Amino acid sequence: MANPDETCPFCTIASTYAPYPPTSPPPPTSSLLSPDLTAPETHLILSTPDVVAFLDIMPLSPAHLLLCPRPHAQKLSDVPPAPAEALGRYLPVVSRALVRVLGEGTDWNVVQNNGVGAGQVVGHVHFHVIPRLKDRGAAGGPMEERFRKSFAMFGKGPREELGDEEGREMAALLRGAVAEVLQQEAKL
């Protein structure tokens, strides 16, 4: 990996987990996917030579995942060409995988912040892919609902730590769905 930042949690993930063929991911019990190689656990979805995807440790909803380039880049304008191309390639793939796992009719946001002033918390480019579940209603009226949706869209709102067992199960489902999506694309 080019220019890893030893203090960056996403560089740690990118340097810990080796790439594997996304059409045939290792079994969940494989040491290649061991979530406890990092602390907190990493629930890997995808690991290619250029990008990694994993579940957010403080998800806004089930299956909230992050897709990031393997090399360290603080802002989208800093991402080298090959990882940038891979980000564009795999955003639709992980989106389709998410729909396969959560069901047709699932809505989702794709959010990417550039810099602290834009709300970026980890200084390594990453795209949030956030499913929007239909049963997350607001306690109040239309204004509260509008405010809640606006807040949640930009990564704020109710968040809980991802449970390790829940993370392992969801990551396995999403890895399988990514493989299915890519296998289906290969037939087209």
Describe the residue ranges of each PLM region.
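Histidine-centered divalent-metal-coordination microenvironment in nucleic-acid enzymes
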Residues: 115-138
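Long, well-ordered alpha-helical scaffolding segments within enzyme catalytic domains
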Residues: 82-101, 164-173
